[in-house]
UniProtKB/Swiss-Prot annotation:
Organism, as annotated: Actinobacillus pleuropneumoniae
List of catalytic residues: 29, 98
Name of the featured protein: RTX-III toxin-activating lysine-acyltransferase ApxIIC
Compartments where found: Cytoplasm
Family assignment from sequence similarity: Belongs to the RTX toxin acyltransferase family.
Role: Protein-lysine acyltransferase that catalyzes fatty acylation of the protoxin, thereby converting it to the active toxin.
Amino acid sequence: MSYKNVKNLTDDFTTLGHIAWLWANSPLHKEWSISLFTKNILPAIQHDQYILLMRDEFPVAFCSWANLTLTNEVKYVRDVTSLTFEDWNSGERKWLIDWIAPFGDNNTLYRYMRKKFPNEVFRAIRVYPGSTEAKIIHVQGGQINKFTAKKLIQQYQEELIQVLNNHKKIVRG
């Protein structure tokens, strides 16, 4: 059994409170369940795979990400609630899990992420409030070569589509 330093645990609970407040103020997230909140937020905090932007000691934006294997990526695309704690840091394929900026700080968070991950490519499942449809979007770091980013995005997309199509063939049998 392992124990966390009390200060860090206190910091984690403070962080959790800040994120909960942002979640409650997001037109999209405030309609989601507390079980989804814990499934999306606790692993991000525990793996230190999040950004929480503060202004004047006030939380204004939050972003979390998971590093997935292709297998876990397929699982996530099929069911965004499927990730386990272990899945969050299982591979090199970066996915934005949550992006919350309910007070107009979306561009600030975007610039921060591009600077923090200058040579990375992220994907995200974008859901719009009131919609039952989603789409996969791409976000790239501020210094990655556009050709390299495009090539990587295309590779990831082709691999994902191939696995999804193979699964359909198996299911249809």
